[in-house]
Amino acid sequence: MLRDITIGQYYPSDSVLHKLDPRVKLMGTLVYVLSLFFFRGAAGFAAVTLGLAGMIHLSKVPFRYMVKGLKSIAVILVLTGLFNLFLTPGEPLASFGIFKITEEGLKSAAFMVVRLTYLILGSSVLTLTTTPNRLTDGLEKALKPLNRIGVPVHEVSMMMSIALRFIPILVEETDKIMKAQLARGADFESGNLLKKAKAMVPLLVPLFISAFRRANDLALAMEARCYNGGAGRTKMKPLKYEKRDGAAYLLLAAYFTGVIALRAWLR
C-alpha cells in the first residue's frame, strides 16, 4: 500500500502537460481544485469529470498508475463517506439502531468522496508531470510579487519542493523498515484496525531517525554547494512562456468560466 502513493513522484514522459510551464500547471491545479467546490448535481459532476479525464489523457500517465494512489487513502475515503452518510440530518431512508441513513446523507457522502478522490487525482497530475526542480522554479516565479512585502519566496518554494520530494523517499524508507521487522517476526496484518495501528508504532522511532539522517545529509550537501538562499542566484534554464502556455491559460479560463456559468444556471 505504501508504494501506491503517487503524490510527490514524477512520471517521465514527453506529453503536452510535461512540456507546459510549471506556472501554468500550478494555476491549472488551483483552478481545478476550486472547481471541485463549485459543481452541483450530475451536470457539474460531468464537467469536473471531463476536466480530470482530459488532464490524465494529456499527461500520458497510465490510468492504472494514477488510480493506484487512491489505495493509500482508502480508509480516509471510507470514513469520510460513513461520517457524511450517518451524521447528515434529513429524510430517513433506513435506520440501524441509533444510526440513520438519509437521502441528504447519501448525496453528501457521494459528493464528499468524489471531491476528495478528484482532489487527490488532480494534485497527482501536477507532481507526476513536473520535476521537483521545475516545480520549485514555478512556485518561486508565481509567488515572486510577495517578495515586495518581505516574504522569503525562494526559501518557501524550496521547502515545499523538498517536502514533496521527501514523500516518496519516506515511503520507500518505511517499506524497508517494515520488511526488516517482518523478517524478525513482526505482524502488521492480523487483528482489527486498532491492533494494526498499534503494530505500526515500532516503525515510528526508526522512521524518525532515518528522516533526520536524510535531512542532515541534504543540509550538508547544500552547504557543500555553498547554498545561501535565493539572493543573487541565476537559473541554468530560466522559465519562459511559449505559445502552448498561452493556449493552456485560455483553456483554463474557458473551463473555469464554464463551471461557474453551469453552477449559476443550475441554482
Regions found by a protein language model. Give the residues of each.
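Interfacial helix-loop-helix linkers and transmembrane-helix boundary segments
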Residues: 46, 62-70
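Juxtamembrane/interface alpha-helical elements of multi-pass membrane proteins
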Residues: 73-186
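Transmembrane alpha-helix interface motif
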Residues: 1-44, 48-57, 141-151, 155-158, ...
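Alpha-helical transmembrane segments and their membrane-interface exit regions
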Residues: 51-61, 76-79
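Membrane-helix interfacial "entry" motifs
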Residues: 14, 37, 60-65, 96, ...
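Loop-to-transmembrane-helix entry motif
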Residues: 69-73, 77, 113, 117-120, ...
